[in-house]
Swiss-Prot record:
Organism for this UniProt entry: Haemophilus influenzae
Enzyme Commission number(s) from the entry: 2.3.1.28
Protein name: Chloramphenicol acetyltransferase 2
Domain of life of the native organism: Bacteria
Subunit structure: Homotrimer.
Catalytic residue positions: H189 (proton acceptor)
GO annotation, biological process: response to antibiotic
Designated gene of the protein: cat-IIH
PANTHER family membership: CHLORAMPHENICOL ACETYLTRANSFERASE, SLR0299 PROTEIN
Amino acid sequence: MNFTRIDLNTWNRREHFALYRQQIKCGFSLTTKLDITAFRTALAETDYKFYPVMIYLISRVVNQFPEFRMAMKDNALIYWDQTDPVFTVFHKETETFSALFCRYCPDISEFMAGYNAVMAEYQHNTALFPQGALPENHLNISSLPWVSFDGFNLNITGNDDYFAPVFTMAKFQQEDNRVLLPVSVQVHHAVCDGFHAARFINTLQMMCDNILK
């Protein structure tokens, strides 16, 4: 996969990157609730399922913003031209999950075809990584449909240069006449700030509101 190398001598976040990568090593998570009322109504008019469409939308937003596509490669900071989703699939019989991946395509019908092909081949394979090693250029998506939450955090240790974002969805919440979806965004502070996380959420909400428009 192609990528662009970032020149740390001229990058406007070089001081922030150095601080949060070398001195105050940290990431952060932001949890919010998406209003998916209109989204679910629009989705009901299609043959698409909720989870893969959310995988598509999250991937689409990630591929708009380079701060969510950053990685260390050959001791250099880069951002991928494109990142592909790694998503979890739960196995009821073993109470375990697998991590599958498919190629991101801007066209939703092409994306769904790729997703469905992966699911047809691997959804019943209970290995953690049925397809083998994950692609370098990946983002992470998972779902906890059994419980709702107001906050969610992963404690990632031992890999200070793991910059791939992690997105976690929860069980729907009903609030008056609205349906809300809790979503957690977890990022490395060396490459992503609160502004970027908020922009991601706001863009994702807009995409949910206009999924078929």
